[in-house]
Structure formats: structure tokens, C-alpha cells
Amino acid sequence: MQQSPHSLQSQSLFASAVDSAVPLSNLQQTYAVIPRERPYTPLLDRVDSPADLKAFSTADLIALADELRLFVLYSAGQSGGHFGANLGVIELTIALHYLLDAPQDQIVWDVGHQAYAHKVLTGRRDRLGTIRSKAGLTAFPERAESVYDTFGVGHSSTSISAGLGMSLALRYQGRAQTVACIIGDGAMTGGMAFEAMNDAVQQDADLMVILNDNDMSISCSIGGFSRHLAMLWESGYQVDISDAGEPILCRRPDMQAFDRRKRHKKQRDVPQLEDNLFKAIGFTYFGPFDGHNIPELLRVLSLAKQVKGPVLVHIYTTKGKGFAPAELDPVGYHAIGSLPAEDDAPKIEKAAAKPSLKYSQVFGQFLCDKAVQDNKLLAITPAMEEGSGMIEFARQFPERFFDVAIAEQHAVTLAGGMATQGVKPIVAIYSTFLQRGYDQLIHDVALQNLDVMFAIDRAGLVGEDGATHAGVFDFAFLRCVPNMMIAAPKDENECYHLLNTCYEYQGCTAVRYPRGVGTGATITQPAQTYNIGKAVIESVLGEKDAPKKLALLAFGTMVATAQQAAEMIAKSPLLASSCQLHVVNMRWVKPLDTTLLEQLLLQGVTHIATLEEHTIMGGAGSAVNEYLLNDSAAFKNHRPAICNIGIPDRFVAHGSQSEQWADCGLDVEGVVNQLQQLLS
């Protein structure tokens, strides 16, 4: 049964939205809690494609915005997902699809955190509740999913380059179609966005860029560019329509609607700007405007559509708009999990178990502990203070914490520059985003063998965010770089001590650890320094004189999976008496423990299996193969059967982490099956 947005009754914290009528003015609804039942959305239910919007009046569009916002609230409660950014672009999404003729006109979303409303209006309304789940809708726009998703995204700052490419190709083919790129102020801090804008002016391309300025990326936007946008806002409208007709006469948006800025920026006298960055580089500039005012958006976007050459429309929005808790805490509500079931039975309290730490928390604890001991430690993050576990470090050591915004290339070379002056920089970065700073890692850090440590978070399969965020290529692109040393801890305690080991090393190092919680291992003190390039035999199962001897070489958090798989094989009636198993925690991808490999070969190992949460091609198993084939003395005389277990040569679709592991044969059952095939 559907619930009307006009009649929802408050039932519990998660049960319903605030009861109030949908106005036909531009005063949007604000809801207090997330509805459990599908809301009543008569206007939205009439929209199966953007073409259906053409019959709506402006008043209908305003009312539709409330219905769409409530529907996104409901759907996010069912499936979880990115939240605040989606609520902030409801009106913009409606205005774009009303004015443009998608899919002939091209709409390009940057990052994709804000594309849920776009998915709803483009025929995917009834599947939005499946978003991020296995075989459901993807978390981001994806070309294979819909003709309306013009460019696949997930990383930031790509939209203007992609949109410019579309515009130039359309011009070359003589096709008159509008290309509109939507980019946030956080993504605009990425250098790639400015490279594209510079080229758009050079090419005199017909390109519309919409700057969705909510003073946030995932957390608060920072830096000189963010301050420049604030000055544009506080100085009033800077409307340039010299190529588009008469000046737009409209009121300045209510400052109180965006008073969150006052919490982030020092009050100051603001000059009346006669020019701005966008106009200075050659864009026609409209703005700033209220991004929640549909009539105003329709007027401005209609004019911008008529402009020849590159044009930028600057709008202000509120992240989490219309959901009171998200407006108050936009960082906390950047993304949410699904709501708990109402009928969840209360759990019987047992002896309280200490919760497992997230690996990002382990890193944060190490940072704070080490910073007390060593005043040379400096920490850098490209806009991932919260996600990387650095909030407490930033609070305790603000002068040693550097958030460089979404600028991975800069972050890596910044660390290199710091290292030349006798300090020890640590770059905390997600594996998938380190790819964006690869040239800098090689040219600016490793080539000079500078003393920089990389703390690589979100390594391996990351679950619902899917292939765009998977960290499954780092072993391959790091281990081929001279001077680079790579560690892969099996649990929280080992992560802490490997972080310390790499910190104490003079040179380029990387510690790679996964998303989420660990195994529950207790972190021991004081911090240890492990032997570099030395593995640990975790267990030996089976009879010493068994005819088959398997060495299971596990990297990182796959050690626990390897141990469970080995125990199952040791109990197997078919293999228990015929196979001895060595479970090895390799710890290091580079340098490998080649001494241990030689010892295992000399002991008569008949089978070797490598296990990693990384692509098989180029991964740690490949490193073992290369050593055995090229450098091992023992392997020339004794050649065991070899199996590499890891991620196959394909992008792994979104789903839960456990579903992804099973899909790749990296769950315990999958590993056992592959080992049994090897031993058969």
C-alpha cells in the first residue's frame, strides 16, 4: 500500500516523513525521518521517461520535486546508498530533463553520487530499490545500464573532459545536440576539470557546465577554489548574458538558506567581484543561483542552452536538502545503509565482546601513536579525512595534517617535496584513487627513492560501490616500480606493526589493507618492526610423510581464508591421509620471502597455490611465478604443480563483498574447490 506524502504519520525514528501538504510554491518539504512504506507519488508515477515531463506545468514540476525527493528517501532506506548528494540535486535533475531532449542531448554526471533522481526519471523508478545489490542497478551511471547514462563514472573530475569529447565529436559529425556536464564544487578541485575547461575555451566548444556548489565533497570543500566560490556567493550575482539577450532580473537567494557556510568560513569583508575565475579563462558565466528554485533554474538553463561556446551555470544547493538530519549532518549522511527490519527481534545480551576495529581505525590509531613519538610525521589525504580514519589525527595535530582536496596527483608529489626536507610524509589514499597519481608515484617519488609511505585503504573488492571503486590492481602497478616495497597485513594487529615497519624504513613503501572491519585481533604494544621480506608459516596440517605436500601462499587478509580452507581439506576423507598442507602468511609482496620458497621446494613440496584478493594477472601470484621460473635454483630440479587463485581478468560487478568473493571463487568454498582440483 502506498503512503501519501501529505498524510504520512510519525510511527518511529525510521517510520515516516513529516506530515505536511505539498505546496505549489517553491517552498520544498522537509522530512524528519525515512518512510518505510512506498510513498504516494501520483505525479512521479506518470514519468516513465524524460519525455513525459514535457506535459508538466511549472507547478507540477515543483510538486514533482517533493514526490521525487520522498521517493529517493524511501528507496535509500530500502537499499542504502549515496544519500545527501542525491537529495541536493532533485530540482536540477527535473529541470535538466524537462528542458533537454535526452538521450539525444547528452547529460554527463561527475562522480555519480547524485544520479539517483536521474535514474528514476529515465525509466528505472521501480528498480531503484535494487541499487548497489547483486544484479540490481549500479551505484553510478553506467552506459551498459541505460541509454540515458552517457558516460560511466565513479571517480571525480571527469565530466568536463568527457562532455567536451562528446561536444567535439558531435560538432565534427554535424550534429546539433546539447551537452551538459554536472560537476560538484568538490570535484572541481581536481586538476583534470581545469585542464578540460582550458581546452573547452581553446576549442570554442558548445558545452554547458553546471557547477553544483554545496560547499561539500564527501566532507567540507577546502582550499582557495572553495573560498573563491564563497566570494562569488557573498558578492551577489555575477550574471553574464551578453551573448544571450536581456539581463535576468531575479532576487538573490536567501542567505539563511545556505548559512552552513558560516560554520566553515571565517567572516570577512567581501569585495564586489568585477570578474571571476570562470570568466577570466573564457567561459560565459551565469550565477550564482538557487539550485532548489525550479522556475529560476528553467529560466537560466534555457538561456545557457542558447549560448555559443563554453558556458558555466553556477548554482548553490544544500547537500541532504529536504531531510532534516542530513542537512544538519551532511558528512554523516553522505551515504547510509538500509533500514533495519521492523520485526527484528531484540538480541539477548551476551558478554560484551570488543567490536572489531575497521582497518581505517587501525591506521588512525597508528598515526596518532606515532605522531606523539616522532615530530617528523606529516599526513596527507586527497579529501578522505573521514574515510581514511584521520579525524582524530587532524584534531590532535592540525599543523601536521594536509587535506589537499580531490587532487591525487598533487598529493603524491606534495609528499615527495616534503620528503626532500627531512620529514616523513604518509599519503593516506584509497587503492582505486592511487591509480590517478601513478605517474607522480613513479617519477616524483620512486625514481628519486624518496622517503614516502603510502597507506593504501579499500584494497581488494569493496562491495556495493562495484568495479569503479575496487582496489584490485595495486599489487600489479606497484610491484613493477623500482625502489617500491609492498606489505599486505593479515589482520588488524599485523596492519599496525607493518605500518610501523614501513614508517621506520627509509624509502618508498606501501601498506595495503581492505575496506571494513578486521578479524578481531588485539593490537599489541609497543609497536614492532618486522623483518622486511620475511613470511610466516601459520600452520602445518597433515602427516609429514604424506605423498602430497601443498604450500598455500596467502597474501594479506586472505590468510584467514587460506587457514579455513586448509583445515577443511585436512578433514576431507579423500585427502586427509594423502596431503600435508603448509599455510604461509607471505606478509610482503615485494620483496618476496624467496628464502622460504627455496626451503619449501627443498622439502619436497609437490603443489604450490597462491591466494590473493587481487587480479591474477600481474598480482602477487605472478610475482611468485616469476621468481620460480627466472631465479629459483631449487625449481630447476624440482617443479611442483602451481595454481594462482585470485580475481579473474574481468571487472567484478557490484554486490556485497561476500557475494563478490563467491563470484570470484575467493570464499572458503571456492578456494577449497580450486585446491582440490590442484591436488587431484
From Swiss-Prot:
How many cofactors are bound and how? Binds 1 Mg(2+) ion per subunit. Binds 1 thiamine pyrophosphate per subunit.
Catalysed reaction equations from the record: D-glyceraldehyde 3-phosphate + pyruvate + H(+) = 1-deoxy-D-xylulose 5-phosphate + CO2
Q: Binding positions for thiamine diphosphate?
A: H113, G154, H155, S156, G186, A187, N214, F323, E408
Q: Name one GO cellular component term.
A: cytosol
Q: Which GO terms describe its molecular function?
A: 1-deoxy-D-xylulose-5-phosphate synthase activity; magnesium ion binding; thiamine pyrophosphate binding
The protein's UniProt keywords, in alphabetical order, are: Isoprene biosynthesis, Magnesium, Metal-binding, Thiamine biosynthesis, Thiamine pyrophosphate, Transferase
Keyword Membrane: yes or no?
Answer: no
List, alphabetically, the Pfam families matched: DXP_synthase_N, Transket_pyr, Transketolase_C
In this chain, Mg(2+) is annotated as bound at: D185, N214
* An individual GO BP term: isopentenyl diphosphate biosynthetic process, methylerythritol 4-phosphate pathway
Q: In which pathway does it act?
A: Metabolic intermediate biosynthesis; 1-deoxy-D-xylulose 5-phosphate biosynthesis; 1-deoxy-D-xylulose 5-phosphate from D-glyceraldehyde 3-phosphate and pyruvate: step 1/1
Question: What EC number(s) does the entry state?
Answer: 2.2.1.7
Cofactor(s) annotated in UniProt = Mg(2+); thiamine diphosphate
Question: Which EC class is this protein assigned?
Answer: transferase
**What does the sequence similarity comment in the record state about its family?**
Belongs to the transketolase family. DXPS subfamily.
Q: Which NCBIfam families match?
A: dxs (TIGR00204), PRK05444.2-2 (NF003933)
Purpose of the protein: Catalyzes the acyloin condensation reaction between C atoms 2 and 3 of pyruvate and glyceraldehyde 3-phosphate to yield 1-deoxy-D-xylulose-5-phosphate (DXP).
State the oligomer form and interacting partners.
Homodimer.
Q: What's the name of the protein?
A: 1-deoxy-D-xylulose-5-phosphate synthase
The gene is dxs
